[in-house]
Amino acid sequence: MADIAIRRAHEGDIPSVEHVLREGKAAIAELGISQWQHGTYPNHEDVARDVAQGHCYLAEDETGAALGTIALSFDGDPTYDAIDGAWLTQTTSANARYATIHRTAVDRAAARRGVMSALFAEAERLSRAAGCESMRADTHPGNTPMRGLLERKGFTACGTILLTRDDPDPVRVAYEKVL
């Protein structure tokens, strides 16, 4: 694939981010798991908030077409304060020294072209630049493609967390990578 450019998304990118997330939601449905399949998550409000807070990043090809997205936050995630297991680093959302990855997706037309790897590499670069000691992420236990990617990128499964939003299947495998 030609070069992938990654940049912080702005308000005008919201429709493109939403499209990529719908593509990701459809790909997850094809796996036969419930992640992102109940209710409206992720929705317009989630994307608009990510963009407004500077947490949303967009991967594009040389024509400017949206290929993938990732939400990267340095604010801590209270959901991660209660883990059935143990994090590799000892920090809570109140004094977060970790970056959190959420809402990652790739347009199905761009699958297997290194987009997610590029997004994760940029997230790691930004996390290091921000002085984070680690990165955390979570995914559905049945999302084997994402679990495999996290492990290939050096993340360690640390236990399970429970989502705080309304979800009939709230258990997620929690991962951390020490930087």
Where are these regions (language model features)?
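Conserved acetyl-CoA-binding loop-helix of GNAT-fold acetyltransferases
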Residues: 106, 112-125, 148-152
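Conserved acyl-donor/pantetheine-binding loop and adjacent beta-alpha core of acyl/acetyltransferases
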Residues: 71-105, 166
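A short beta-loop-alpha structural element at the N-terminal edge
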Residues: 5-19
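Conserved active-site alpha-helix within GNAT-family acetyltransferase domains
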Residues: 117, 129, 141-159
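Conserved GNAT-fold acetyl-CoA-binding loop/helix
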Residues: 18, 25-46
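Conserved catalytic-core motifs of GNAT/GCN5-like acyltransferases
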Residues: 77, 138-139, 151-172
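Conserved beta-strand-loop-alpha-helix junction that forms the acyl-donor binding cleft
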Residues: 111, 137-147, 166
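Conserved GNAT acetyl-CoA-binding A-motif
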Residues: 127-139
